[in-house]
Regions:
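Long, contiguous binding/interaction regions
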Residues: 1-14, 23-41, 45-111
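Glycine-centered tight beta-turn/hairpin loop motif at sheet-sheet or coil-to-beta transitions
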Residues: 18-20
Length: 111
C-alpha cells in the first residue's frame, strides 16, 4: 500500500509506502511528475486515467490545471474527453509516457 500526495505550488508529487520509504518528483506539472514516478516504479500498476495509453495533456490543459487534467482520445474520433488524471481506470494502462505520446501522435493522424 502507498499514499500519493501532491503540491501544486512547486509542482511535485510524493509517494510514501507502508514501510516508510518515500520518493518525491518535481517537474513542470503533476502529469510529468506522475510519469517520472511510473517510470521508476514500473512494476506497480497505477489504476488511474493518467496511466491510460490514450490519455495525454495538451499544453493548455497542462498549464491551466498544473497537469491534473488531460485528454482521453479514441482513434478516428476528433472529440477529446477532458479527464482528471487520478480518476479510477483499469483498462489499457501503461507506465511508459512514450507509449502515451506515440498513441497521441497516431490519434492526431487518424482524424
Amino acid at each position: 500500500m502507498a499514499t500519493i500526495e501532491y503540491d501544486r505550488s512547486i509542482p511535485s508529487l510524493s509517494i510514501t509506502f507502508s514501510n516508510g520509504a518515500k520518493r518525491t518528483y518535481s517537474d513542470t506539472d503533476i502529469f510529468i511528475c506522475f510519469g517520472l514516478l511510473r517510470k521508476e516504479f514500473s512494476d506497480i500498476t497505477f489504476l488511474c486515467k493518467g496511466s491510460k495509453i490514450n490519455v495525454y495533456p495538451s499544453a493548455m490543459a497542462s498549464q491551466m490545471s498544473s497537469g491534473f487534467v488531460a485528454y482521453e482520445v479514441e482513434m478516428g474520433d476528433p472529440e477529446a474527453k477532458l479527464v482528471r488524471i487520478f480518476d479510477y481506470e483499469e483498462n489499457e494502462l501503461t507506465n511508459d509516457v512514450n507509449e502515451q505520446i506515440l498513441y497521441r501522435n497516431k490519434w492526431a493522424k487518424s482524424i
